[in-house]
Curated annotation (Swiss-Prot):
InterPro entries with a match to the protein in the record: Actin (IPR004000), ATPase_NBD (IPR043129)
Oxidoreductase in keyword set: no
Main location: nucleus
Originating organism: Schizosaccharomyces pombe (strain 972 / ATCC 24843)
Compositional bias segments (type: Acidic residues): 78-89
Protein name (database record): Probable actin-related protein 8
Stretches for region Disordered: 50-92
An annotated GO cellular component: cytosol
Length: 662
């Protein structure tokens, strides 16, 4: 018989629980609710900002010894803080804020307290391991003499030039301007016999101070304007790199993404330390305002912010859209902003301090295309400087200077004109040329309205070869910002053979494109109805479209197709032209006429120049300085610690108007 089991000894009157954990009852799914991360004040970035604000208020109260402030006085102080900050605090803040505006050709950088920014060319000269043959672009090598004895380029260029020439003649006829008899032949005959005149070095006050190194004293990197003063024929081991192209990374000239980002870092560092005289060790005490394009590239913005935070160690940063800064700089609350840069043109409508998302358009042409077109037109007239090489920085600067000095759209200048210029090269010294021109100075700016004449084949052809396409983490689809106006123009201006089909390799697409041979050139309608349009999956994002039609499409999309609305009238009466590419004499008047001819039902169409006291290229930069004074910007600063912890996720909460998507 088994022994009896002993009972555990329990002391009467002692009631201990076996555990201290509370038993959680089952959740009633019918009444389940939570507020976790459903309010902005629960986010880390907002809780962190609120904690800093409370700490400052506590410190201020303890310093003043006035802990009990009445409600009326407190509300009065809050109302005063809603406007512009006091002058003393604002000036101190401006002295610690750097405004950064990156362009395809130049970098505008400076303290928010400065009147004008410092302009730094976005170029860097790097010493390569071995000498290499410099690229050349001689226009005389790509043109030929036809049967009539005239200089001509390819057939497509000549056909587009005939259309451009007929359009100019019809416009001059409407202005009751007579053509010059035998003017073209007079220009060619003079240019054929024009010879350069050598200028002694002592007689040239603007002689460039070319860089010459001592033996074994070469530097690895030269940034900014100094890179243009390097004689590449004497130092073939150096190569010029342009890290930004058409407002995005220039991936075609680089072998790796690290090299491209390193060049941008070197240009930033040179601009801040050498030109602004601010050591890198003190940048943690500074803030930076980064002006981003309206139709920005996510990878571009994120990589630039990585450089600002991780490499330069800025304390805080804020990003703001380009058109919004332009409206601030011009003092306009509503406008259609047309920013005409060196390699791209941006169009956006701003209303009440917010960029209308569906109105944003980016066109891939700019002032550089006008420069190249102008030089081609001069070569057709036997330009005396036949050896001009547009790949060298000094000859390209010369061509750009000729465009700025002589091009215009004023009918009063339509005549045979005698012009002169100085060519300064390191190998041939200074030479003076004289030449005559007739309609070349007017035909070149007209290219904005017939952009098919530009060289558009190789634009953005190496896009996304070094950096990945930004995609959404959930559906793995591209998530760069989209605009209905941009999508519309891409659909109606892209030939069917350029549309990329899913699941087809390059050989299959090539075979299909060989089968498609359109007999008639496709001419799309100028404006289409703004309905629900899905963006086509195209090979690249290149958009070439007439400027006046693009402006009409932008305003059309901003008003949801209702041109009779008061909003459309306000936008058409305030078309703001900024940037360096659209400041030709008479250009604004011609643009106004062309828009009015297609929008006759709009009573007032006005193309507004920038303020008189401000350079058209500095309006956006100056607007960012004004943005720095607005009280709300204190809530939009991204701290270095925020970026290190959250990365790009912080941008959707820290942008004015919440324009960052994803």
């Amino acid at each position: 018989m088994a022994p009896k089991r002993k009972q555990p000894y329990t002391e009467e009157g002692i009631d201990f629980k076996f555990t201290q954990f509370q038993i959680v009852p089952p959740i009633n799914q019918k009444n389940f609710y939570t507020e976790y991360l459903k309010r902005d004040d629960q986010m880390y970035i907002w809780r962190d900002s609120a904690g800093e604000k409370d700490a400052k208020e506590t410190e201020s109260e303890s310093a003043n010894g006035d802990t009990k402030q009445d409600d009326s006085k407190k509300s009065q102080v809050e109302e005063e803080e809603d406007g512009i900050e006091e002058s003393e605090l604002g000036e101190e803040k401006d002295n610690k804020t750097i405004v950064l505006h990156i362009g395809s050709q130049n970098l505008r950088i400076g303290l928010a307290s400065n009147k004008t920014p410092t302009t730094v060319p976005m170029v860097i000269a790097r010493k390569m391991r071995a000498p290499f043959a410099q690229e050349r672009c001689l226009l005389k090598d790509i043109c030929h003499v036809n049967e009539d004895g005239n200089v001509a380029f390819d057939s497509e260029f000549d056909s587009n030039l005939k259309l451009l020439d007929s359009e100019l003649k019809s416009w001059l006829k409407a202005q009751k301007k007579r053509s010059v008899p035998n003017g073209t032949q007079l220009v060619k005959n003079y240019n054929k016999i024009s010879k350069p005149e050598t200028v002694p070095p002592d007689d040239d006050p603007e002689k460039p101070d070319w860089i010459h190194f001592e033996q074994d004293d070469h530097v690895d990197v030269i940034c900014g304007k100094e890179a243009f003063l390097l004689p590449l024929n004497e130092y073939p081991e150096y190569k010029l790199f342009y890290p930004i192209k058409s407002g995005v990374f220039n991936e075609s000239d680089y072998a790796s993404s690290q090299q491209l980002l390193a060049d941008i870092y070197e240009i930033f560092k040179y601009s801040i330390t050498s030109l602004l005289q601010i050591p890198v060790s003190q940048l943690s005490q500074y803030s930076v305002i980064f002006i981003v394009p309206d139709l920005y590239d996510r990878v571009y913005v994120e990589k630039i912010l990585d450089i600002l935070f991780f490499d330069l160690h800025f304390g805080k940063a804020a990003i703001v859209q380009e058109s919004l800064c332009t409206s601030f700089g011009a003092g306009m609350s509503a406008a259609c902003v047309v920013d005409m840069g060196a390699q791209k043109t941006s169009i956006s409508c701003v209303e009440e301090g917010v960029v209308v998302p569906n109105s944003r358009i980016k066109i891939n042409y700019g002032g550089d295309d006008i420069t190249l077109l102008f030089m081609k037109l001069l070569m057709r007239s036997h330009f005396p400087y036949q050896d001009i090489d547009l790949k060298t920085p000094y000859d390209w600067s010369l061509a750009n200077a000729l465009k700025i000095k002589y091009c215009g759209l004023s009918e009063a200048t339509y005549n045979v004109q005698l012009n002169s210029f100085f060519s300064r090269t390191p190998d041939k010294g200074t030479r003076k040329f004289t030449f005559k021109s007739l309609d070349e100075t007017m035909l070149a700016p007209l290219g904005f309205f017939r952009p098919d004449i530009f060289e558009n084949e190789n634009k953005l052809h190496d896009r996304y070869t070094l950096f990945p396409v930004p995609v959404d983490v959930y559906d793995n689809q591209p998530n760069n910002p989209e605009s209905l106006a941009q999508t519309t123009l891409l659909q109606i201006s892209t030939p069917i053979s350029n549309i990329k089909a899913n699941g087809k390799d390059d050989e299959e697409k090539k075979e299909e494109s060989d089968l498609v041979t359109p007999s008639v050139k496709f001419k799309p309608p100028r404006v289409v109805y703004c309905g629900s349009l899905a963006a086509p999956e195209i090979k690249n994002e290149k958009l070439i479209y007439p400027l006046d039609d693009a402006i009409n499409q932008s305003i059309f999309s901003a008003c949801d197709g209702n041109l009779s609305d008061e909003k459309a009238k306000n936008l058409y009466s305030s078309i703001l032209i900024v940037g360096g590419a659209g400041q030709f004499p008479g250009f604004a008047h011609l643009l106004e006429e062309r828009i009015h001819s297609k929008r006759a039902n709009i009573p007032t169409i006005s193309v507004i120049p920038p303020p008189r006291s401000m350079d058209a290229q500095f309006v956006a930069w100056k607007g960012a300085c004004i943005y720095n004074r607005i009280r709300i910007v204190s809530e939009l600063w991204i701290k270095n610690s925020d970026w290190k912890m959250l990365g790009s996720r912080v941008l959707q909460y820290k942008t004015l108007g919440y324009f960052w998507t994803g």
